[in-house]
Amino acid sequence: MTNKIIIPTTGDKITFIDGKLSVPNNPIIPYIEGDGIGVDVTPPMLKVVNAAVAKAYGGDRKIEWLEVYAGEKATKMYDSETWLPEETLNILQEYKVSIKGPLTTPVGGGMSSLNVAIRQMLDLYVCQRPVQWFTGVPSPVKRPSEVDMVIFRENTEDIYAGIEYKAGSDKAKSVIKFLIEEMGASNIRFTENCGIGIKPVSKEGSQRLVRQAIQYAIDNNKDSVTLVHKGNIMKFTEGAFKDWGYELAIEEFGASLLHGGPWCSLKNPNTGKEIIIKDVIADAMLQQVLLRPAEYSVIATLNLNGDYLSDALAAQVGGIGIAPGANLGDEVAVFEATHGTAPKYAGKNKVNPGSVILSAEMMLRHMGWLEADLLLKGMSGAIQAKTVTYDFERLMDDATLVSCSAFGDCIIDHM
């Protein structure tokens, strides 16, 4: 395959030394523009980040952007069958920190999702989704300000592993036959036309996710970590996730049982504050985040539950149009727009770029460039001034409608 990616002649790589990121003053950061509305939201993101870094650091720090390709743009740059070039994956791995727009799902065989493929191929096992409300953002709930949570969603296992077989296929029939004849399964109905999926959940995968969630709670002085699961039904996968989570809290963080367990607590070694480790059944949690959101701060959960919870919570604070996200491994991090490609709006300079801009703010914090929280100040100022894109303008009184790119400019003006 011909190399298509052009490395900047200036700038240095972010490296990982002794367990920590080492970020130069002029880091090279790869980005994927994205499909559909990626062409609309990514350019304002780059402009806003550059402005925030310049305002925070003058000329002392600067990002050197490196475009890499995935999705539809990759099929045009390479060939029609290449949706996720090996060259792109290698650079995301090598340069440690990157950001991407939304990617479409290829039609037909092969990978089921480019987003999932990137997470699995780079072992980005944490999907981190902070959910908080900006003053002035239209919300369907009465007290959106009570929503302030960070979701840690396991990113590589569960049914998203993609191990499933089409109804009526030879593979599905073989699996069904094995389950019935070898494993004694007796409750598979309609065996001739039954799709089959596998739900892998490992102790190692569960505990490394919970470890990151508890460490985040310690580092950010949070009150609790909630293990969300459906263990009352799926005892050996979802239930095991819960049990392994408690086990890790006790064995690695020194947590003590509360009232005989399974809830437990540990003392924050930095502040002395008590952190409660608790669990909630997934369907009950979907009620709790509506009725009692203030009782939850850090959530650790498996892949599917995390998908549901992330979008449900985002709806309470303005929708996924401004919901940021990060995919994190032990060394590599890929930040992303959490919404889809919305092809009917592509190229119309209309949609809200907030998701990928706020993901960029997460990226800067991950790099240790904390002064660049000017992004948050700018976003909040633009929203409170009611100079907003159509998704907010239609729900606000006396708001001024602006384009996608103009909203980015408004964020810069309010830094």
UniProtKB/Swiss-Prot annotation:
- Gene3D superfamilies assigned: Isopropylmalate Dehydrogenase
Q: In the record's cofactor note, how is the cofactor described as bound? A: Binds 1 Mg(2+) or Mn(2+) ion per subunit.
Which EC main class describes this enzyme? oxidoreductase
List positions binding NADP(+): 104, 339-345, 352, 390, 394
The EC designation for this entry is: 1.1.1.42
The UniProt entry's sequence similarity note says: Belongs to the isocitrate and isopropylmalate dehydrogenases family.
Q: Which residues bind D-threo-isocitrate?
A: 113, 115, 119, 129, 153
Q: Superkingdom of the source?
A: Bacteria
Q: What is this protein called?
A: Isocitrate dehydrogenase [NADP] 1
Please give one Gene Ontology molecular function term for this protein.
isocitrate dehydrogenase (NADP+) activity
Query: Which cofactor does the UniProt annotation name?
Result: Mg(2+); Mn(2+)
Q: How does it assemble?
A: Homodimer.
Q: Where is this site: Critical for catalysis?
A: 160, 230
The answer to whether keyword NADP applies is yes
- What turns on expression? Expression increases when acetate is the sole source of carbon and energy.
Cross-referenced SUPFAM superfamilies, in alphabetical order? Answer: Isocitrate/Isopropylmalate dehydrogenase-like
| SMART domains assigned to the protein according to its UniProt record, in alphabetical order | Iso_dh (SM01329)
The organism named in the record is Colwellia maris
NCBIfam families tied to this protein: PRK07006.1 (NF005425), prok_nadp_idh (TIGR00183)
Q: Which reaction does it catalyse?
A: D-threo-isocitrate + NADP(+) = 2-oxoglutarate + CO2 + NADPH
